[in-house]
Amino acid sequence: IPAVIVGSNGHVAWGFTNSYGDWLDFYRVDWANKDRSRYRVAGGQQALRVASEWIRVKGGAPVELKVRETRWGPITAELDDKTSLALRWTAQLPGALNFGLSDLAVAGNLDEGLAAADLAGIPAQNLVIGDSGGRIGWRLTAQLPDRAGTCEPTSPLAVADNCRWRGWLPPTENPSLADPADGILWTANNRTLDGDALRLVGDAGYANGARARQIRDALRAKPKFTEKDLLAIQLDDRALFLTRWHQALQDEAARSGSVELKALADAARTWDGRASADSASYRIVRAWRLAVIERIQNGLLAPAQAALGQRFVMPDLPQMEAVAWPLLQQRPAHLLPRRFESWEQLLADAATDIHGQLSAAGPLSDRTWGERNTASICHPLAGALPRVARGWLCMPADPLPGDGNMPRVQSPGFGASQRMVVSPGREADGIIHMPGGQSGHPFSPFWGAGHAAWVQGEPTPFLPGDAQYRLRLAPET
């Protein structure tokens, strides 16, 4: 989109996080004939529409892509000889995308900014916006589907469910909050809604709330903040979420006969409580937790895996902590995965697995988080080059602090796309970070500019410096 996605115009400043709402439905398509040219609908049958999309290949023949369309959307998967799945997704519907986001650049206050956001055709996002008068607001932006009938989100919809999309909800139905009583707003890919609003938006995999909680608590800690104070919140790599898991590892090792469990606990005994690049304890505790949760999840989903066989796909369950931690505290026998004789054996088995992985590379005390969390940030075309030349299109392989469940969210290939701190009207005091820099041209003198500051967390100015080049677009006539 040729617009300023996030930024400040002197009157309002705004930014986004992903909404993780449920913006699609799968429909079961029951074929009415063997050649799959007709499918069943309420009250009869309907003909399948087939459209050809041609992909032009340089130096080769065009490739035809046939798109099979139903009344609900395109066929995207096959269940068996008689049934397929069709996808109905907001992004594929008329009116879903437009250039309305560009109007935020000329908004003069909070109300104008929220009004502009209501007309923006973008993927659904959490918008946080503030104006120079001190007002702040949050709104779930984008077009929201108006569902009717029985639209159960946990399984593919059948014709009998009569789930239909009647178009778009009016913008007044979008969840919104302006001028909160406590004067703060926060969002970090977490669930922001409850009750009827949550039922309207749905759940497509909200992030664990640990990161959002640290941000909220930091914002509540002081009445006023400078730009550097707010940058410090974004750079917070405290591992508060894992503190109880560190204690669980120590407690379990103290009463266990597992040599590997004791070795992990000994190597992680000094707990600095941060996802710092030089921390071995953080890496050990994190890995053990994930191994424990993996065993619990596999056990709970074993019946589904047995029933589906090769069709089973392990779901991504970012809220699994809310299941796993109570199980570890209560240790109910009827929910213990069958391959283990006790919960203690499960915990020891997870330790054996992690001990084997980490010790294979050397002493546990040397297996730092930075060794695992090393930047792998490359130009999209890097994968097309021979390995020996790939480095020309990649940023340095820096050991990175931070992780997913804390404000300084960053991993080898994922993280906050930028950090921004700005008060509208005071852009000269603002701060900006962008991993990889703003230039996508590897031969540009600005290739990678600012990347080192992002790695180190050093403040860099929000406003650009003096212009050094000018690109002029002039029509021929």
How should these model regions be labeled?
Residues I1-G257, D266, T270-T477:
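C-terminal/peripheral segments of proteins
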Residues L261-K262:
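N-terminal small/hydrophobic-rich alpha-helical segments that act as secretion/targeting modules
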